[in-house]
């Protein structure tokens, strides 16, 4: 391992020699052969920031202006908490991570080259978030509170150890009432025979308020010096209420007259939660403490709900009102959606050293996963509120997965050389049943053999060279598969595809690390490709009478229909860099950035897009007189391309001040702000097809400011002792959540 990156405001060595205080700084970044670790706990900004904000500093991780997270340049990655996979976080990283305070986190690992013991999914890699509490014993309790221009929050962490039993608990609550957001879109239709319906324009605004809760309870019992039992229970989630309104107008070619226009009013409530529990039993060999076997069981449930009402108002022109309602299906509706993923996992892992140089690890796992979706759709004729159940527009199905896997890995460590090859076998048995709505029941059975290899070489005492190859797979998640026909906006329709197959990706990486007392650097070069990527496809409905889909669903002429398919071929090459300069014992300057070139193709759809993207984030941390800590950060990105268009660039800046008081710095105060010069910030997206061009912009609240306070009591000397091996499920394609109607994320 190599340590790089030092924090300027925390003292880890204090020797008083003739009245002079000699100060050294704690390392923030640690590099191993297959991962990079960022020490959140020792970064002063963690006292006031969310986990999402802290991720901007983590090497190999980027967060764009709309808070979308990427690892190694890919939005397909997995998130673990304390070594255990968390599908809810993986599916909703933006929503979850920006709601969780960073002061509950000890460090974040970026596992760049997952070995054979990890499930074969996660193209970008794995983020392992480790919570506070490791390496101490005794008792402690910390109480936290915060307030900002969007809401308030509070939390507590407590730990107690008595004899062989250790228990820790953590709970946080945040209430959020964000300012109203705005969006607008423009689409031009290139079809020559519809000049009176050529330009579609819409604008809308929305507002939401709700709460986010996060809590966990962990306990461990040392049966004796060789046996350890660990039990954990956790939950987090959110419930909110929202309302939105919008205007839609279809212009002719001359932009003077309109074919139709209408208003919409929508209000609803929703919730999403993740509830999990696990138990691990670890047995260590009496002769060799490095030889151990672990038995693990995990259960996880992820219920989500969405209940909304949509009303169409002021439909014009009056003389064609009935025809417009019929053509566009502008009937007031009530949508009541429920989804849930229930998962049970059984796992055994065995590790044994062979001599002083070699280590063998092997294991097996069985996962039973049950995805269920029940979307009920009710319609009202005309302007009434007499809603009637419409079975044709409703959907209910069950998606069962049986996943069996086994792995074997080998590690050789000789002086400064490390070599880690591995092989994993996975078999997946799928069963899909439709209870309501379109679709036929089907079964599928497929298997994958997944190789991996990584190696590291120490080049002297201060330099390290690492390289590796990984094959990764992604199984489509419930949001990609759900066949629910989402036409809440009749001109922007989305639907999942239950026939999706797993996508496979191959990646090669090479990295170099160097550190001295002043300068620290990590460079990582990565190339990846896949030939059956799951991509979102959008096309314009060109039939003058509209298009009928399975189940009798109709998309009107001029609507943009989006779904998913295994149509993508991608080639991506990226360079990540992390630079840290310890200008003085009280000053730290850092830069974290990435440059990436992408080539995206879909021969079947005759689509091709390519281009560069770059992002950088940096800052300075300074200890001022009076032990006041100053943190100034900023960064930005160029637009990132997609298969059918590109997004928007962004810029970001923040300022924070913190001060600790009392003996052992038990009381901490923090004030912070970001983007204070602009209340709103606009992000643009551009999409093109064979017969249309679509542009959209979203205006989000940007200005943010607030303060936080925390107080610690008790003596902390040890924490929960955890099993060295536990369950890691990395096998669901993430990033598709955020809604409850499945198919796509609508416009």
Regions found by a protein language model. Name each.
Residues 21-46, 69-80, 84:
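N-terminal periplasmic "start-of-domain" segments of outer-membrane beta-barrel proteins
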Residues 429-431, 461-506, 527-556, 676-690:
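Surface-exposed extracellular loop regions of Gram-negative outer-membrane beta-barrel proteins
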Residues 2-13:
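Single conserved hydrophobic/aromatic residue that forms the stacking wall/gate
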Residues 51, 57, 84-112:
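Short acidic/polar hinge/loop motifs at secondary-structure boundaries
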Residues 120-127, 135-185, 209-213:
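Outer-membrane beta-barrel translocator/receptor signature
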Residues 343-347, 388-395, 495-497, 501, ...:
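Outer membrane beta-barrel strand-and-loop segments of large Gram-negative receptors
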Residues 9-10, 19, 23, 51-54, ...:
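N-terminal periplasmic accessory domains that precede
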Residues 214-222, 226-238, 266-433, 458, ...:
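Face-selective signature of the C-terminal outer-membrane beta-barrel domain
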């Amino acid at each position: 391992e190599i340590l790089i990156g030092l924090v300027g405001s925390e003292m880890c060595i204090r020797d008083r020699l003739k009245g002079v205080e000699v100060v050294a700084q704690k390392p923030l970044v640690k590099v191993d052969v297959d991962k990079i670790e960022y020490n959140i706990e020792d970064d002063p900004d963690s006292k006031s920031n969310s986990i999402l904000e802290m991720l901007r500093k983590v090497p190999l991780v980027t967060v764009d202006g709309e808070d979308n997270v990427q690892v190694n340049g890919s939005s397909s990655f997995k998130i673990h908490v304390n070594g255990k996979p968390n599908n809810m976080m993986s599916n909703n990283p933006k929503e979850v991570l920006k709601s969780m305070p960073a002061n509950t986190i000890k460090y974040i690992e970026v596992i760049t080259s997952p070995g054979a013991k990890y499930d074969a999914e996660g193209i970008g890699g794995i983020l392992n978030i480790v919570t506070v509490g490791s390496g101490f014993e005794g008792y402690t309790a910390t109480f936290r509170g915060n307030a900002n221009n969007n809401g308030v929050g509070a939390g507590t962490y407590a730990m107690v150890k008595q004899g062989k039993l250790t228990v820790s608990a953590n709970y946080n609550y945040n209430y959020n009432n964000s300012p109203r957001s705005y969006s607008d879109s423009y689409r031009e239709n290139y079809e020559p025979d519809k000049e009176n319906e050529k330009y579609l324009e819409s604008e809308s605004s929305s507002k939401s308020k709700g709460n986010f809760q996060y809590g966990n309870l962990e306990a461990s019992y040392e049966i004796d010096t060789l046996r350890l039992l660990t039990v954990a229970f956790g939950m987090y989630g959110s419930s909110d209420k929202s309302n939105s309104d919008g205007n839609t107008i279809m212009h002719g070619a001359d932009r003077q007259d309109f074919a139709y226009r209408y208003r919409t009013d929508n209000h609803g409530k929703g919730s999403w939660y993740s509830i999990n529990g696990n138990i691990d039993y670890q047995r260590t060999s009496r002769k060799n403490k490095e030889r151990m076997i672990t038995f693990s069981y995990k259960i996880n449930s992820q219920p989500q709900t969405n209940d909304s009402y949509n009303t169409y108002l002021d439909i014009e022109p009056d003389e064609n009102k009935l025809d417009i309602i019929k053509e566009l299906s502008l009937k007031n509706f009530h949508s009541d959606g429920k989804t849930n993923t229930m998962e049970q996992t059984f796992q055994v892992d065995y590790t044994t050293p062979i001599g002083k140089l070699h280590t063998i690890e092997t294991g097996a796992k069985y996962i039973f996963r049950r995805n269920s979706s029940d979307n009920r759709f009710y319609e009202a004729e005309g302007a009434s509120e007499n809603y009637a159940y419409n079975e044709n527009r409703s959907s209910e199905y069950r998606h069962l997965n049986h996943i069996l896997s086994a792995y074997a890995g080998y590690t050789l460590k000789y002086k400064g050389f490390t070599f880690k090859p591995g092989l994993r076998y996975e078999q997946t048995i799928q069963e899909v049943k439709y209870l309501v709505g379109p679709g036929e029941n089907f079964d599928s059975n497929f298997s994958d053999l997944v190789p991996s290899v990584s190696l590291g070489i120490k080049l002297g005492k201060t330099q390290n060279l690492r390289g590796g190859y990984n094959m990764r797979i992604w199984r489509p998640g419930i949001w990609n598969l759900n066949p629910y026909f989402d036409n809440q906006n009749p001109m922007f329709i989305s639907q999942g595809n239950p026939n999706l197959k797993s996508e496979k990706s191959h990646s090669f990486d090479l990295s170099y690390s160097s550190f001295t007392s002043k300068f620290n650097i990590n460079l990582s070069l990565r190339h990846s490709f896949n030939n059956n990527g799951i991509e979102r496809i959008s096309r314009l409905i060109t039939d003058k009478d509209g298009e009928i889909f399975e189940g009798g669903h109709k998309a009107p002429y001029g609507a943009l229909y989006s779904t998913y398919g295994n149509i993508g071929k991608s080639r991506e090459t990226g360079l990540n860099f992390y630079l840290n300069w310890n200008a003085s014992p009280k000053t730290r300057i850092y830069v974290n950035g990435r440059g990436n070139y992408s080539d995206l193709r879909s021969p079947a759809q005759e689509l091709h897009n390519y281009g560069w993207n770059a992002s950088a984030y940096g800052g300075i941390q300074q200890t001022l007189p009076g032990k006041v800590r100053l943190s100034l950060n900023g960064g930005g990105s160029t637009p990132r391309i997609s298969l059918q268009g590109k997004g928007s660039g962004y810029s970001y800046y923040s300022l924070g001040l913190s001060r600790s008081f009392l003996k052992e710095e038990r009381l901490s105060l923090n004030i912070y702000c970001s983007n204070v010069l602009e209340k709103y910030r606009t992000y643009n997206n551009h999409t093109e097809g064979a017969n249309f061009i679509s542009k959209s912009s979203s205006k989000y609240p940007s200005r943010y400011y607030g303060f936080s306070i925390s107080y610690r009591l008790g003596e902390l000397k040890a924490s929960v002792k955890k099993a060295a091996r536990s369950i890691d499920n990395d096998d669901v394609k993430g990033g598709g959540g955020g809604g409850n109607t499945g198919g796509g994320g609508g416009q």
